[in-house]
């Protein structure tokens, strides 16, 4: 099944909900970064949250997320856009921690204490950045805290990544439910009860439930209007051309030094782990471009 995201709104306009299946997206990130289970779960949850929040973006708007904890994972960096594209990496993808007493991956301990920073570039003069302290490092709670405090939109967030014994991703997905002005107590009570009874998202997705099925579970007893659904996936904007322009930008001295010391340059994209090799001829051509520009 292809990964995709669904939007829905209560018929009376009291709340909106976004739900996504991201299994293939998270598995691609795992494969590219060769990440171990706890890093896969942390990165996968963050990427899923980025896609769900990206559902509110338009046109060329972008979203950048930094989870900066003091745990062994280091930083988690993710970007998404209005087209349902996401990319991301974790600073230390190969760490192992014992499971929690409940048998879960110890994502909170791996992330540690710190801050969540979210930057939205909406094409205005300055991007908007909001920051909150991490509540638990489990990612979903941290995003709910951010949306409720920094964006003043009471929100419930559920994110799940299920990893197999061979480290591959079995299921991944998430949902964000946001109350809108005028939401009454009765609706709140129904939603809270439904959310309490909701099984783990990753197990629902593993069993074949779709984002629509999950929305129906969460909103049982409330009339809903389903809006559009859109494909989502891992996509990096890096390219050989972009990195060549980067080399042009660092200047003559740096490129000359690369030529003299290594005779080549190797550049790795953090986001997608793609390697780009520039040999002696490439660097000489780049040097010529710099000289022509100067």
From Swiss-Prot:
Under oxidizing conditions two disulfide bonds are formed involving the reactive cysteines. Under reducing conditions zinc is bound to the reactive cysteines and the protein is inactive. Pfam families: HSP33. GO terms for molecular function: protein folding chaperone; unfolded protein binding. GO terms for cellular component: cytoplasm. CDD domains: Hsp33. One of its GO terms (biological process) is protein refolding. InterPro entries: Heat_shock_Hsp33, Heat_shock_Hsp33_C, Heat_shock_Hsp33_N. The keyword Transcription does not apply. It is found in: Cytoplasm. Its main location: cytoplasm. Keywords: Chaperone, Cytoplasm, Disulfide bond, Redox-active center, Zinc. Disulfide bonds join 236-238, 269-272. Belongs to the HSP33 family. Redox regulated molecular chaperone. Protects both thermally unfolding and oxidatively damaged proteins from irreversible aggregation. Plays an important role in the bacterial defense system toward oxidative stress. This is 33 kDa chaperonin. The gene is hslO.
């Amino acid at each position: 099944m292809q990964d995709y995201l669904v939007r829905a709104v209560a018929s009376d306009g009291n709340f909106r909900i976004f739900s996504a299946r991201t299994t293939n997206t998270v598995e691609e990130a795992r494969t590219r970064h060769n990440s171990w289970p706890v890093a896969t779960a942390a990165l996968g949850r963050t990427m899923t949250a980025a896609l769900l929040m990206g559902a509110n973006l338009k046109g060329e708007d972008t979203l950048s997320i930094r989870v900066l904890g003091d745990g062994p994972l280091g930083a988690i960096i993710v970007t998404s856009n209005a087209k349902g594209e996401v990319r991301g990496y974790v600073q230390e993808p190969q760490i192992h921690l014992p499971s929690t007493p409940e048998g879960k991956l110890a994502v909170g301990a791996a992330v540690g204490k710190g801050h969540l920073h979210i930057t939205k570039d909406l094409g205005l003069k300055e991007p908007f950045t909001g920051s909150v302290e991490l509540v638990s490092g489990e990612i979903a709670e941290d995003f709910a805290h951010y949306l409720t405090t920094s964006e003043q939109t009471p929100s419930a967030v559920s994110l799940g990544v299920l990893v197999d014994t061979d480290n591959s991703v079995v299921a991944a997905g998430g949902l964000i439910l946001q109350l809108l002005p005028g939401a009454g107590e009765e609706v709140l009570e129904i939603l809270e009860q439904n959310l309490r009874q909701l099984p783990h998202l990753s197990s629902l997705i593993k069993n074949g439930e779709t984002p629509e099925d999950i929305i129906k579970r969460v909103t049982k007893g409330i009339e809903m209007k389903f809006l559009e659904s859109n494909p989502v996936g891992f996509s990096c904007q890096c390219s050989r051309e972009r990195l060549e322009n980067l080399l042009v930008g660092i200047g003559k001295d740096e490129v000359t030094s690369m030529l003299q010391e290594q005779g080549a340059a190797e550049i790795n994209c953090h986001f997608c782990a793609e390697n780009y090799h520039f040999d002696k001829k490439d660097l000489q051509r780049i040097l010529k471009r710099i000289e022509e520009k100067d």
